[in-house]
Swiss-Prot record:
Subunit structure: Homodimer.
Protein name: Uroporphyrinogen decarboxylase
Chain's gene name: hemE
Record-level Gene Ontology MF annotations: uroporphyrinogen decarboxylase activity
Gene3D superfamilies xrefs: 3.20.20.210
Amino acid sequence: MTELKNDRYLRALLKQPVDYTPVWMMRQAGRYLPEYKATRAEAGDFMSLCKNAGLASEVTLQPLRRFPLDAAILFSDILTIPDAMGLGLYFEAGEGPKFERPITCKADVDKIGIPDPEGELQYVMNAVRQIRKDLKGEVPLIGFSGSPWTLATYMVEGGSSKAFTKIKKMMYAEPAILHLLLDKLADTVIEYLNAQIKAGAQSVMVFDTWGGVLTPRDYNEFSLRYMHKIVDALIRENEGRRVPVTLFTKNGGMWLEQIAATGCDAIGLDWTINIADAKKRIGDKVALQGNMDPSILYAQPERIRQEVSTILEGFGNEGTGHVFNLGHGIHLDVPPENAGVFVDAVHELSKPYHK
């Protein structure tokens, strides 16, 4: 494999010294970039784009041509897993993802198998291999999956949800069925992420987008427990390097200690928590990723720089282990030049903290 020219992102996740704070953006390959829109139009639709390794690699690399980002993230979707399980994923204009065959009972759970990462999901592995080749060792490649709980919310609700009534009904009325589903999903995510690592992902991330809708007790039982199972079973060394694992629960600020106790290398933070507080609580155990509100990218350049400065100051210069990111995905109507201001500000303003 090609030698890695910029390994700052991996070093920061492992709390090793770096000369500036590395940065990437959730959804950095996406609709805010005109070149992405052009490639997506060429593909025809979103899933066709994911399933074409050449085009998936092209959109993964697009933000790196514009901005000096310190990592690339696989262009894919968390719903590849339920789609491969046969739930019939489709997209309705303006409504987001939907499933033709949602999970409603034990028979539905029994029916789904664990998809083969080099079978039904081979297109994802082909994309990973293609991206690694096309990156030529410039920056590391991040692989990812949704968390079992977050995947289950889409599978039981039949798509996106605001109130999560169907899955919460299952959770309280028939918890055994939900545990059966979550267990199957955890086994699937383990195989899926390990296959991404074997195909060339140099770090992996688990997105628990909807963990924050749970009570503290239910978060531990229905979300964290399964992420812990995943962390325990992941390949942690490949190509002679550590493969860092990041867990990200949106609105999970009250559970940082429990998340850190899973043995993950890093925790993703959203913007609702102060990074200085997070560092005080768990900075000795894990690296932190985050945590600027993506909406700040609508602001004037000076305001963006000011926010970057505040977050860097919050993390401080005591110890290492900060990867700068947004607290969630970049919005689709952010001017690309503002993303450039953000990335440049992180590099420039963080250097004094690493002397």
